């Protein structure tokens, strides 16, 4: 007899006592170094996973947690750093990640706008002519973390390519589909590496499909 399985689209990152916000502000004010910051965020992240496990959730989302913004996470995973920030390739450094979100004295932050019709604001990715490339398989990293630290085989979460492009800027209206086509092989690589790791379920979010899109985009 088949079993009905429970899942969860995502878990609030803020924490019961706003732990996430407090750790973030400590790092921004130079009260903790990067290593301490990452360890403290890991504690919060794994506590959220453990709580869902203890409540009987079968397919626990992994990768929904973010150090700042999940759309920005997707952008940096594909090397999406605006040209005004001194990015030299490879995995995007933490300080560069936050520079995109907050800006520096010489480089303005990326735009923020509402996530659909909610009060949540995300960092708008910018396509500035550089080719997207996979520089870090973040869903795989979160899957391994939960498996190694908690023995949990969860469900990696990632924003789908169509939604990611539609929420971005820096390209002409007619170039959106071409950008999606460039991203598809990179997403395929992410999924292949997850499959090789033994991942059985992946949650790919495409909320843009719930909005009004053109026939051309559908095709």
Regions found by a protein language model. Give the residues of each.
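Domain-level signal for soluble alpha/beta catalytic cores
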Residues: 1-219
């Amino acid at each position: 007899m088949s079993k009905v399985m429970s899942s969860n689209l995502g878990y609030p990152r803020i924490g019961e006592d706003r732990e996430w916000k407090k750790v973030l502000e400590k790092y921004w004010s130079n009260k903790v170094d990067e290593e301490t910051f990452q360890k403290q965020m890991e504690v919060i992240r794994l506590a959220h996973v453990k709580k869902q496990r203890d409540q009987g959730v079968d397919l626990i989302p992994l990768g929904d947690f973010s150090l700042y913004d999940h759309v920005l996470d997707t952008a940096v995973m594909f090397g999406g750093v605006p040209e005004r920030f001194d990015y030299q390739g490879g995995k995007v450094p933490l300080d560069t990640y936050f520079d995109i979100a907050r800006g520096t004295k010489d480089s303005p932050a990326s735009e923020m706008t509402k996530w659909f019709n909610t009060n949540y604001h995300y960092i708008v990715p910018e396509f500035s002519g550089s080719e997207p490339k996979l520089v870090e398989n973040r869903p795989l990293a979160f899957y391994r973390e939960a498996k190694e630290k908690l023995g949990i085989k969860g469900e990696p979460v990632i924003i789908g390519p169509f939604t990611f492009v539609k929420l971005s800027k820096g390209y002409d209206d007619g170039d959106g589909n071409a950008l999606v086509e460039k991203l598809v092989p990179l997403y395929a690589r992410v999924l292949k590496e997850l499959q090789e790791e033994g991942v059985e379920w992946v949650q790919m979010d495409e909320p843009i499909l719930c909005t009004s899109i053109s026939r051309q985009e559908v095709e």
